[in-house]
Amino acid sequence: MNLKEELKAGLAELGLALSAPQELLLVHYVELLDKWNRVYNLTAVRETGRMLSYHVLDSLAALPLVAGQRILDVGSGGGMPGIPFAISQPDWSLTLLDANHKKTTFLKQAVIELGLTNTEVVCERVEAFQPERKFDVITSRAFSDLAEFVRLTRHLLAEGGEWAALKGVYPDEEIAQLPEDVCVREVIELKVPGLDAERHLVKLGLR
């Protein structure tokens, strides 16, 4: 199967219905990631088919479980999960935050080439980031442990908002280290097409 066919099969397995233009944008995103990765080392994954599973489908597996209009992707890196979210949900407002200049250079170019008018890229350390408005959902995929994630981002969470962290195996120890005023709302096991590994979405909120 080519990349487009693999994507279609993966979306069907996830039960996600995207338009043909959205599917093309996701394929183009993988191609951009592959091209820039050769110079900027954005991901250890080197093959486009694996990038599709490890990065795009892994991000999209969490998409139906995220509820909010203003989303912050912390430590966005190569744009996961923020860019797949932005392509799939054009009515959402996405902010991709990373302190690494090379990564945000890629992100800015990807946003331009993909025509993502709902997406802003910010190069700044998360603890120094002071946006005009706070966020409904703060997400991360490979940023830090849960306690550190919450500590560094709590000033960015809107009232009633939630954290949504993509993790591998069930993070028992990380959950045990959370501060007392943070509750676990839900931990959902994710099944990612083409990925034979444990994946979980951890949703947290303030008590």
UniProtKB/Swiss-Prot annotation:
Enzyme class: transferase
Subcellular localization: Cytoplasm
Record-linked Pfam families: GidB
EC number: 2.1.1.170
Keywords of this entry: Cytoplasm, Methyltransferase, rRNA processing, S-adenosyl-L-methionine, Transferase
GO CC term, one of those recorded: cytosol
InterPro entries, A to Z: rRNA_ssu_MeTfrase_G, SAM-dependent_MTases_sf
PANTHER family, sorted: S-ADENOSYL-L-METHIONINE-DEPENDENT METHYLTRANSFERASES SUPERFAMILY PROTEIN
HAMAP family recorded: 16SrRNA_methyltr_G (MF_00074)
Annotated function: Specifically methylates the N7 position of guanine in position 527 of 16S rRNA.
Family statement drawn from the similarity comment of this UniProt entry: Belongs to the methyltransferase superfamily. RNA methyltransferase RsmG family.
Full protein name: Ribosomal RNA small subunit methyltransferase G
The organism's taxonomic lineage, starting at the top: Bacteria, Pseudomonadati, Pseudomonadota, Betaproteobacteria, Neisseriales
Gene from which this protein is expressed: rsmG
